[in-house]
Amino acid sequence: KTAFALHLALAAGRAGKQVLVNSLEMQGERLGDRWLCAQAASLDAGHLKSGQLSADEQQQALEAARQLSCLPVYVDDNPKASMDHIRSSALLQKSKGHCDLLIIDYLQLCDMKSEQKNRNREQEVAEASRKAKLIAKELDIPVILLCQLNRECEMRADKRPALSDLRESGAIEQDADVVMLLYRPALYGLTSERKSKFPSEGLGMVILAKHRNGETGDVYFGHNPTLTKIGEYEPTLEWMARNARSSC
């Protein structure tokens, strides 16, 4: 989910939008490494992590860093941030003209301490979800709030996630205008995706499970974990030829 969100941040930044990323899970340096790989043409994430880069990869990293430095993407990597802190940070950036999009990674890591006692976890998550919604309305910006799923989807044959899998609170579904569930069949050892029959290698899906003002459905994307890249999905020519023969 982090890789997908970071690609959204890059796309918005390239389009000239001011992006604020609140990362409660990863330090800013680690996000920077992922962005370098995403921005470069073919920079191996493993090579970057180990520091063992070829001459070509070094040049790619330098050029990617130069390009990234020009993008209006800002990071707050406070690991103990509450929704109130995130709101204050977003308000400050908005006052400077630096916040057209807010990304929060992720909901369950937010500091949910409150003066209200005897609240259960579901109530805490519901309050945090509601505050994220209020931030979006107050600042009049889209807020992308990442969230963990529970393990129920792993009990299904195809492991496909559903709205009911949103972890710890049904309020998330109620508050959100759009709910996008990420799904990669290959992670579960599946060789193809059930509905499309596409081969699972390199395949990712955005399942639009809720869209308040539009249609729901599935969107396919290509994923290369070695290069930390997300883009258009294209089945191999071999698969297309084989599938065409089987359809005859």
Model-based region annotation:
Residues 11-98, 112, 219-222:
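Cytosolic-facing regulatory segments adjacent to core modules
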Residues 64-74, 131-145, 175-177:
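A structural motif corresponding to the C-terminal end of an alpha-helix
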Residues 24-27, 31, 120, 143-151:
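Von Willebrand factor
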Residues 24, 53, 106-107, 148-149, ...:
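Short, ordered loop/turn segments at secondary-structure junctions
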Residues 30-32, 109-114, 152-155:
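Short acidic/His/Gly/Ser-rich catalytic and metal-binding motifs that mark active-site loops
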Residues 3-4, 8, 31:
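Hydrophobic positions on the alpha1 helix immediately C-terminal to the Walker A/P-loop
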Residues 41, 46, 56, 82-99, ...:
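C-terminal regions of RecA-like/P-loop NTPase motor modules
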Residues 20, 99-145:
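Helical hairpin unit composed of two closely spaced alpha helices linked by a short loop
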